[in-house]
Amino acid sequence: MVALAFQGHLNPMLKFAKHLARTNLHFTLATTEQARDLLSSTADEPHRPVDLAFFSDGLPKDDPRDPDTLAKSLKKDGAKNLSKIIEEKRFDCIISVPFTPWVPAVAAAHNIPCAILWIQACGAFSVYYRYYMKTNPFPDLEDLNQTVELPALPLLEVRDLPSLMLPSQGANVNTLMAEFADCLKDVKWVLVNSFYELESEIIESMSDLKPIIPIGPLVSPFLLGNDEEKTLDMWKVDDYCMEWLDKQARSSVVYISFGSILKSLENQVETIATALKNRGVPFLWVIRPKEKGENVQVLQEMVKEGKGVVTEWGQQEKILSHMAISCFITHCGWNSTIETVVTGVPVVAYPTWIDQPLDARLLVDVFGIGVRMKNDAIDGELKVAEVERCIEAVTEGPAAADMRRRATELKHAARSAMSPGGSSAQNLDSFISDIPIT
């Protein structure tokens, strides 16, 4: 298993290995040296489902690692260093995260079958594939207002497409994406952290192009009613927030988190905090870095009054599954999207980049479990009234009951998919049986 040193890459891989722990397969997770220190506190975790191996990305330790430089170095030096790990031990299959097009080439060079663990939506894979393989017409991507019609997806605007496709991302990103599409010729399986019942029409629409195999939701087993296990978080977990949640009323707390990479902006923090105060609702807010919230007076006042908690990191699966949570204000990253689906929590969708805008469309218009929060059309700023509107819509508005009902339906469907005989469980069994064991 090959992943880069990002929480959004590592956690799905580890959970994938955990779900296959019942088999006689042995897993090694190879990741870059940058993850060594981050994972040091959990490296001896007795329940860890994989061995860890680290390889150099070819850059000095103090290099800032801007995306373009990192991508070039991984392709040149990372590939050679990964090959050394592979040569030390015979592997029967290599599973890689997306957007590392050099990994399938390394697998092919060693005559090892390769799978991609797609950690975005099936819908996102469909969009990327149809664009880069030129199977469907697309408008001029310079014009964000142009519409895009694709099978099994709602009518999209260019602004809804994954941002990595857009010309504004630059030539290097577009080259990387084209290389990823090309590397699919060396990929035998496209495994997706989703489940058939969630994206059935999209999955069916890809069956004659590049079949995708849903094997999720890849979440900690306790969310599926099984034994409770720790996740391999790269930030220290703040247990106080769970103790605080235990003291709150059922379905009363607004949970806010914009992921492990995006940093909160002070003006957005103040806007959302003011809306929370006006609504009079308790909140649990993950802000990174935490200092971004320390200068926001209205937020600090509410924390001092015991009306909310601010933490730099919390174990999201446990937070979302807590009975006190009423809704989730989210950036709509796919890991967060899957976790909110499995826990049955309605969302306020506030996407920013990559696949998040498309995930927001899925959450609101396909899954039916949330509303979209938008910046002002004139000045581009988030307004207090808009935040209040969205919180009301998902907690007590006329459509709130339907969202909650639909969220509960998807929660049960997710559990069924991973249960013995379920759609994802069957796909996992088929994948395992298809691996040529030497």
From Swiss-Prot:
Q: Does the keyword Phosphoprotein apply?
A: no
SUPFAM superfamilies xref list: UDP-Glycosyltransferase/glycogen phosphorylase
Q: Which GO terms describe its molecular function?
A: UDP-glucosyltransferase activity
Tell me its EC number(s), please: 2.4.1.-
Entry keyword set: Glycosyltransferase, Transferase
**Where along this sequence does the record place binding of UDP-alpha-D-glucose?**
260, 314-316, 331-339, 353-356
**PANTHER family for the chain:** GLUCOSYL/GLUCURONOSYL TRANSFERASES, GLYCOSYLTRANSFERASE-RELATED
Question: What protein family does this chain belong to?
Answer: Belongs to the UDP-glycosyltransferase family.
Name of this chain's protein: UDP-glycosyltransferase 84B2
